[in-house]
């Protein structure tokens, strides 16, 4: 049995160096890097993992990381914005891939999405549902009517913005806002939670 001309008889093969795989996902046309690659949180985690192979984190950082990846939202669909809110959870946009899943009970929810016109009669019910949510709780105001009364701003029966009833974390403008706009609002809320933490709140 002879050796082929390409075979080498030198000692044992040396291990190949580890090479990171090529970037995948949606690329930013300006930088050529994946979208979100400049997020401070992920850069710190990636650098620490590359350095040691493991990372040490404070409990608050761990809780904040877990909370941003498992936000449960409660629907408070009051008008036509609720149609776009429902579309956000359908297969085309699939909000659950961001860890954002709907819940039927306020006691299991972290986020309330107020979508539509808030009337004076509905305001006490909105506050009651908000009070039933466990801390820390967040509110997204969706659409012009929820943000400031919208088309019905001068009506005697309409609350001119749901921020008069509950504290708002994210405002999503539009009449009605698209599902993409609401999804972007959810991603902004996740960034806000990462930035401020959950125990401090």
Swiss-Prot record:
Q: What class of enzyme is it?
A: translocase
Q: Name one GO cellular component term.
A: plasma membrane
PROSITE patterns listed in its UniProt record:
COMPLEX1_20K
Identify the InterPro entries for this entry.
Answer: NADH_UbQ_OxRdtase-like_20kDa, NADH_UQ_OxRdtase_20Kd_su
Example GO biological process term? electron transport coupled proton transport
- Where's it found, cell-wise? Cell inner membrane
Q: How does it sit in the membrane?
A: Peripheral membrane protein
Q: Which PANTHER family match?
A: NADH DEHYDROGENASE (PTHR11995), NADH DEHYDROGENASE [UBIQUINONE] IRON-SULFUR PROTEIN 7, MITOCHONDRIAL (PTHR11995:SF14)
Organism whose genome encodes this protein: Rhodopseudomonas palustris (strain BisB18)
Q: Name the gene behind this protein.
A: nuoB1
Per UniProt, the cofactor note for this protein states: Binds 1 [4Fe-4S] cluster.
Q: What is this protein called?
A: NADH-quinone oxidoreductase subunit B 1
HAMAP family per UniProt? NDH1_NuoB
Q: EC number(s) on record?
A: 7.1.1.-
């Amino acid at each position: 049995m002879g050796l082929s001309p390409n075979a080498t008889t030198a000692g044992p093969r040396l291990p190949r160096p580890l090479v990171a795989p090529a970037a995948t996902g949606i690329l930013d046309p300006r930088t050529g890097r994946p979208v979100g690659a400049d997020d401070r949180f992920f850069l710190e985690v990636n650098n620490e993992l590359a350095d040691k192979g493991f990372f040490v984190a404070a409990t608050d950082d761990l809780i904040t990381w877990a909370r941003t990846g498992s936000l449960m939202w409660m629907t408070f669909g009051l008008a036509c914005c609720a149609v776009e809110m429902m579309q956000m959870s359908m297969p085309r946009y699939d909000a659950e891939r961001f860890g954002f899943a709907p819940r039927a009970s306020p006691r299991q929810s972290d986020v309330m999405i107020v979508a539509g016109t808030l009337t004076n009669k509905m305001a006490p019910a909105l506050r009651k549902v908000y009070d039933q949510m466990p801390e820390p709780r967040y509110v997204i105001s969706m659409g012009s009517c929820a943000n400031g009364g919208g088309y019905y701003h001068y009506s005697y029966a309409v609350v001119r913005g749901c921020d008069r009833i509950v504290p708002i974390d994210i405002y999503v403008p539009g009449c009605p806002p698209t599902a993409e706009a609401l999804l972007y609002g959810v991603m902004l809320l996740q960034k806000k939670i990462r930035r401020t933490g959950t125990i401090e709140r």
